[in-house]
């Protein structure tokens, strides 16, 4: 069936997280702090990795790109959500809604591929250490990053190819703080069951399969690491544990939401907040709290910046 976009709906109303005025003021302050911390934390990782020569390795190159994606993922909807806490009319245009969904799936798809790439990097480093630099060459790392963005773009376009032409004639209330595909297609004036099945197969099941494969991959890596007792193995165990935590935090909410798109659970809003805001905030903490190299480089960078400012202000 071909649909033409003769929608009566020109904008969508975002119901947000709460209708309580007191809670909205609290959310405004809370999420403003969280968003600022997310951007600054991920930006600090990107700058630290770019400026420190001893961090110019495949693992940190991929980590820097992950931080950039996380920073972008936290920015596609959060600034508008924060501003909407102070607005009575929480609306978004049809084009703005489609744009939000495009960037959500672009960044989500890119992050999935990048997390798989980071898993592959750890597998090669631990299971094939003698061939690590040969396999994880600069060309390979750049190729993996480019591949992640290509997959993200194609995934986003595949999700919107049919959605953008659906007729929307009311109601126009989206029960979330941003436009998410499962919620938006429910508002269409036609039966979207087939589109929902397509969404399950391209988003939900892919996320679930990738998550299972990553769990198996990290299990193999951790078993290999546990068989060793050297200091290097202890460091590898710490690194892989951090990677596995990030994978779980990202894939858990995504899988739950997109495997059951026909059912709207009360916890869906919480999960949406988790993988679009909290996970990008926690990733810098998870990757740096037990990583001595990154913490040392951050202290060195901060000290250099502080000394430069002090010198500039000295008469």
Swiss-Prot record:
Residue ranges of the TM segments: 26-49, 58-79, 101-120, 140-158, 196-219, 236-258, 270-289
PROSITE patterns: G_PROTEIN_RECEP_F1_1 (PS00237), G_PROTEIN_RECEP_F1_2 (PS50262)
Cited SUPFAM superfamilies: Family A G protein-coupled receptor-like
One Gene Ontology MF term: G protein-coupled receptor activity
InterPro entries: GPCR_Rhodpsn, GPCR_Rhodpsn_7TM, Olfact_rcpt, Olfactory_Receptors
GO cellular component, one term: plasma membrane
Residue spans, topological domain Extracellular: 1-25, 80-100, 159-195, 259-269
Compartments in which it is found: Cell membrane
Keyword set, alphabetical order: Cell membrane, Disulfide bond, G-protein coupled receptor, Glycoprotein, Membrane, Olfaction, Receptor, Sensory transduction, Transducer, Transmembrane, Transmembrane helix
Residues in compartment: Cytoplasmic: 50-57, 121-139, 220-235, 290-315
Cysteine disulfide partners in this protein: 97-189
Record flagged with keyword Cell membrane: yes
Gene3D superfamilies linked to this entry: Rhodopsin 7-helix transmembrane proteins
Glycosylation sites per record: 5
Topology versus the membrane: Multi-pass membrane protein
Pfam families: 7tm_4
Chief place where the protein resides: membrane
Functional description taken from the UniProt entry: Odorant receptor.
Family: Belongs to the G-protein coupled receptor 1 family.
The protein, known as: Olfactory receptor 4K3
Species of origin: Homo sapiens
Taxonomic placement: Eukaryota, Metazoa, Chordata, Craniata, Vertebrata
């Amino acid at each position: 069936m071909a649909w033409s976009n003769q929608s009566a709906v020109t904008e969508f109303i975002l119901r947000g997280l709460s209708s309580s005025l007191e809670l909205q003021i609290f959310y405004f302050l809370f999420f403003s702090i969280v968003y600022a911390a997310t951007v600054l934390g991920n930006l600090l990782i990107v700058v630290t990795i770019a400026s420190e020569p001893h961090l110019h390795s495949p693992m940190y190159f991929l980590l820097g790109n992950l931080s950039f994606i996380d920073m972008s993922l936290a920015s596609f909807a959060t600034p508008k959500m924060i501003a909407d806490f102070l607005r009575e009319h929480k609306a978004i245009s049809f084009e703005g809604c489609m744009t939000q969904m495009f960037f959500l799936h672009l960044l989500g798809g890119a992050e999935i591929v990048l997390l798989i790439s980071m898993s592959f990097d750890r597998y090669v480093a631990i299971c094939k250490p003698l061939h690590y630099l040969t396999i994880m060459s600069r060309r390979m790392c750049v190729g993996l990053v480019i591949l992640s963005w290509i997959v993200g773009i194609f995934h986003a376009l595949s999700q919107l190819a049919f959605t953008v032409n659906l007729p929307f004639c009311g109601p126009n209330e989206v029960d979330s703080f941003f436009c998410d595909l499962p919620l938006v297609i429910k508002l269409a004036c036609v039966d979207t069951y087939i589109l929902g099945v397509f969404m399950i197969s391209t988003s939900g099941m892919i996320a679930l399969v990738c998550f299972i494969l990553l769990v198996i991959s990290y299990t193999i890596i951790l078993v290999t690491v546990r068989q060793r007792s050297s200091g290097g193995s202890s460091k590898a165990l710490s690194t892989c544990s951090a990677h596995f935590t990030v994978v779980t935090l990202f894939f858990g909410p995504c899988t739950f939401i997109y495997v059951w798109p026909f059912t709207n659970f009360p916890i869906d809003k919480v999960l949406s907040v988790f993988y679009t805001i909290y996970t990008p905030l926690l990733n810098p903490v998870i990757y740096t709290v037990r990583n001595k190299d990154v913490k040392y480089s951050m202290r060195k960078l901060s000290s250099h910046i502080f000394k430069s400012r002090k010198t500039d202000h000295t008469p």
